[in-house]
Amino acid sequence: LVVSCGDLSYYYLEYIISSLDIPLYYIRGNHAKSIEYGIAGSRKSPWGAIDLHRKVLRDPKTGLLLAGIEGSLRYNKGIHQYTQSEMWSMVLNLIPSLLWNKVRFGRYLDIFVTHAPPWGIHDQSDVAHQGIKAFNWLIKTFQPAMHIHGHIHVYYPSVVTETIVGNTLVLNTTAIVN
């Protein structure tokens, strides 16, 4: 399966789906538009992709348990920007599904997908790039195997992009690949 952590065009995600012919799960980044326009028409989401925002899902082929939250911390009233309180609300709303996963599958979550990073992990000091405090709590409480995020663009190989928190690998997917 393929996972997108936001700020990629719907047309690009559709290209990946059609080229690889495998499921693509995504969340939107802070730069996502409400509607994208292109030669194939307008759309509110990528055709064939699975939106993870505020959802907990099980991939039928791999059995992986995924959950996601879109956007970043609010800094200019963009449509995919939220306050810390709003992020807390979204995280807390995932709890019933995570508990049900534990009953059904013996684990809460395998992969937590977000655009923004957790607070104090891979984030930056400016408001637009600060991490989300509720994500730290989710990681510590439900211990997914991975938390993958985008948003923090990495231009130098010396920047830390992988961090272990308890049993969770936190991975910045915007890193340079050497």
Q: Where in this protein do the model-derived segments appear?
A:
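Active-site neighborhood of phospho(di)ester-bond hydrolases with catalytic His/Asp-centered motifs
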Residues: 2-7, 24-30, 52, 111-115, ...
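Short, well-ordered alpha-helical microsegments
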Residues: 10-14, 155-157
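A short acidic, amphipathic alpha-helical/loop segment
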Residues: 12-19, 39, 134, 138
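Conserved catalytic scaffold of divalent metal-dependent phosphoesterases
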Residues: 15, 28-34, 38-130
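Short, structured coil segments at secondary-structure junctions
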Residues: 19-20, 47, 165-168
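A short, gly/pro- and small-residue-rich
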Residues: 20-29, 130-135
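Binuclear metal-dependent phosphoesterase catalytic core
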Residues: 56-62, 138-142, 155-178
